[in-house]
Amino acid sequence: MSGTPRRPASGADSFHKPEPEIVGPGTPGFPEQEEDDLHRTLGVERFEEILQEAGSRGGEELGRSYGEEDFEYHRQSSHHIHHPLSTHLPPDARRRKTPQGQVRKPRRRPGATPAGETPTIEEGEEDEDETSEAEGPVSHTDPSPASTPTSVQFFLQEDEGTDRKAERTSPSPPAQLPHQEAAPQATKKAQPDALVEEAIMVSGGTAGGDDGGASGRPLSKAQPGHRSYNLQERRRIGSMTGVEQALLPRVPTDESEAQTLATADLDLMKSHRFEDVPGVRRHLVRKNAKGSSQSSREGREPGPTPRTRPRAPHKPHEVFVELNELLLDKNQEPQWRETARWIKFEEDVEEETERWGKPHVASLSFRSLLELRRTLAHGAVLLDLDQQTLPGVAHQVVEQMVISDQIKAEDRANVLRALLLKHSHPSDEKEFSFPRNISAGSLGSLLGHHHTQGAESDPHVTEPLIGGVPETRLEVERERELPPPAPPAGITRSKSKHELKLLEKIPENAEATVVLVGCVEFLSRPTMAFVRLREAVELDAVLEVPVPVRFLFLLLGPSSANMDYHEIGRSISTLMSDKQFHEAAYLADEREDLLTAINAFLDCSVVLPPSEVQGEELLRSVAHFQRQMLKKREEQGRLLPPGVGLEPKSAQEKAFLQMVEAVGAVEDDDPLRRTGRPFGGLIRDVKRRYPHYLSDFRDALDPQCLAAVIFIYFAALSPAITFGGLLGEKTHDLIGVSELIMSTALQGVTFCLLGAQPLLVIGFSGPLLVFEEAFYSFCRSNELEYLVGRVWIGFWLVLSALLMVALEGSFLVRFGSRFTQEIFAFLISLIFIYETFYKLVKIFQEHPLHGCLASNSSEADGGKNTTWTEAAPTPGHGNTSSAEQAGVERPQGQPNTALLSLVLMAGTFFIAFFLRKFKNSRFFPGRIRRVIGDFGVPIAILIMVLVDYSIQDTYTQKLSVPSGFSVTAPEKRGWIINPLGEEEPFPVWMMVASLLPAILVFILIFMETQITTLIISKKERMLQKGSGFHLDLLLIVAMGGICALFGLLWLAAATVRSVTHANALTVMSKAVAPGDKPKIQEVKEQRVTGLLVALLVGLSLVIGDLLRQIPLAVLFGIFLYMGVTSLNGIQFYERLHLLLMPPKHHPDVMYVKKVRTMRMHLFKALQLLCLALLWAVMSTAASLAFPFILILTVPLRMVVLTRIFTEREMKCLDANEAEPVFDEREGVDEYNEMPMPV
């Protein structure tokens, strides 16, 4: 911009006439003196010089093009320095004021710069320059005594005429004021290009007056009700200055001066002030740690010191967004009403019912996003605003709107009044207490924001904002230094239930964003402001919950504007709830950073065509496309080169990123990684897990662990009773409930004390039951002692485990793919279902249904006598167990026994299955549903036992449980088994041949234990103390081998019970956004729960009398329940359903979308072939070898299937996509997580 001042239209247009009534007495000839001063200051000769200089420039300078030589000349010349227009006014009109009693410090000059380079200044110095320009323009001419007046008077006092007359008549030099005498004389002569000498404040009289030495004398005598002139007014434009207070303004106002300028001149001024022309730049600014200069210019008013406060570190937080719209209440009074909120997803307030709707993904119109970007590009952006209250923020926002010409000066009061209206929320009317949402304006006035002594209750409304009254800005500045006033008694209240419930869903340390949008008719065009506070503060009566506010967005405008304010408010709210955008908003230094973040958001947005959607199925591709866009967004964020995007700006952020990179570079401690040394994996397990041994007991001091003990006890006792009862049936009571309970207790206690992963639950499982049945059949057919053979199997079992651990063979579990696991799980489920109906059919054969006979009394009695003679039945025989009738043949042909057994079996199954479904239903609160669903099996057993107990005249076979600490059949065996034989010597060849069944048992234990440990140790579960594959395997197998000496069972890690145990000890974050999946906060990794569960299971022998009341038909129902529920989550079972579906109804899963249907059916056919082969082996005398056939499916998958299917098809058909299940989705629970048998 040229340094030539613009020509005003006329003196009458540019200056205000003095008020004659203010002229003090004793000042005759005052108008003539004033006229002389005007002619001397800005005479006609001066304007002619200005016009000649402007004419010499003419249009040729405006129309010419600049080259590199001009740019170089610009850098080397004084034109490179920014001069405001006021610097070209007469010297006496642009003096800089200095309060009395202070001395102008010499200007500190930066170091010399090499020739030809643009001097670089520090950011703080640039702020100092801007503050100096704001407070008063400076002159770059050398001051001289002849041309520099002694004082500058901005406002005339009553005795100004007398002072001026004295200055005219007296030839003596002007009197020195006290602060001038203290200044060294050499300072005025040094540095010819320094700032002008300090201006002298008018003291109302001569220097030698009565109060000439007073330092606090104001510039003018303030009239009653007015405040004195303050430098803060320099922030306003000239047309807003209180000119009515001045008798003789020396500087024309902006409006009157702008009327005399041509359009080209105005454009040139705007270009110089606001644009950044390449090649013609100002001084380079070196960023330092003092903070952003923009925050000084836009965020807050300049204080008394030119230095800005250091910028507070902006660490991104989680956000809570609230959308408030300006609406009318039932009394037709305007108020801010909450219409939507965002924690992660959008929740809208339903207009009719005033309640919150369901959370959903916000759908935005593309036009609203474009309008939002346009308003942000041209609106007011205040970053790092240093305010603590809503009125203070509102004042700053309104001032910035006036300065940026978004609103007129006369609209200031209306906009401010609108910002301070009452805020209402949907939960307010539900509270039966004192309303908390009091108007911020009135409440702020009552609590001391305006300390006026008048009777006005609302200064914002009743008092003018400019002139005539004390300005609120001074009060806001004073308020910063005072502690916040305490609210009156009766206003504060405790948090309501609604607030507490909502606060649980908001993440900890979250900061809020308040969005205010609405229509106001007093504005002629929309106005916008985006505010980021320096520090998050709680604004009273604004949000529905006490969350500190960091961001505010304001959009007001007339209804005639072609703009949907509601949609723009939803757009900025959705942007602030987006993770990437709100991080960019925290780290933004200027407006361009926000615009760049909006563009990045638009790049990943999906636009739907304006076509009618008939059903939700048509929108499936949208979700898939959105996931692809998000994946691409994440990849681009990882691939950004240094210097691109939002880089860390502080040392703390850089150090944090370096730490994250260092942690990511460290190789994960894979427990299955081989060391190459004998027992190397076992040693690593011990070193990894045992240092946390003491913490495993300290971490159990939590109420959640006690609840987990009760739940897991019933979860472990039910299978022990079920499998024990079935084992007693299979082995003729050689091993039954008593032995299984003792095995579970002893091995469970030992494993919880010494194991590496105490979250595993040791128990009996379906595959081991199948093996025990097969081995018992083998021994019985070959006339071998079953229990003695188990002792030698246990011996070889321990040797096999030692060899496997020494060779670090646990890594072989990685080769067991989903192909093998699903065949294994499906086989065990089929066996469970088959055995249930086989037992039920057997009951119907033993107790057939009786036909209806004419004379059924005698025949029935005869039949009754022939079948019950040895049983000696009593009226209470229905409640006796088979153990009490040892050695007595069980009754045969009992009436109604088969029907009652069917009812008990079906009832147990359906109750347990229904309660499992009820857990994820929508009835009752979630906590009640989970308790009922988790205890579904014990509840089903209890209900059916009560049903059976109530029917006394019908016989049912009961569970065989001994009294006290005893084996199931004391007449057949004892607690210690002789390895050489009980009744006869055990064959030596069988001692050696027991190695083969030992290997088969080891395969089963290895697969179940290691796969269960893999599932528990998934990264998604966020376990911190690690696992130990080698140590756990050695402990479980060794304990099983030793227990065989006592006739007890070997156990394995039970998959379903272990996953249930881990889920019960998982602490989920309560701060879960509505509609979002729960996140794991921590897992209570400790040993106490498993230890207590094992002890309680062992003590269950004390309740033998209660266990003897359980009918076997009830256990068959639990057996059926385990078989059916194990099918969930098996893709093989789900793909069988696709055979009966047309392709258009196939689910939208990976193995359907990426693999052709015929190829998918071919893979399924191969699995069916392997399953049929295993079933055939199980049905023959070679059923003992079924684990060997099962393990052959591993090389089949690795060698044969890879030649039939492509690598991509195998990844889709044999991928392990199961993830930990923690949320409550209908039909989904822990059974869907694992393709393993129960």
Swiss-Prot record:
Compositional bias of kind Basic residues: 76-85, 94-110, 280-289
Protein's name according to its UniProt entry: Anion exchange protein 2
Chain positions carrying an annotated carbohydrate: 856, 865, 879
Positions carrying N6-methyllysine: 270
Lineage: Eukaryota, Metazoa, Chordata, Craniata, Vertebrata
Biased composition (Polar residues): 141-154, 858-869
Phosphoserine found at: 132, 144, 170, 172, 239, 439
One of the GO BP terms on file: negative regulation of CD8-positive, alpha-beta T cell proliferation
UniProt-annotated stretches for the region Membrane (anion exchange): 705-1238
Comp. bias regions, Basic and acidic residues: 37-49, 58-75
Cytoplasmic topological domain: 1-704, 916-930
Molecular functions (GO terms): chloride:bicarbonate antiporter activity
Keywords: Anion exchange, Antiport, Cell membrane, Glycoprotein, Ion transport, Lipoprotein, Membrane, Methylation, Palmitate, Phosphoprotein, Transmembrane, Transmembrane helix, Transport
Lipid attachment points (S-palmitoyl cysteine): 1170
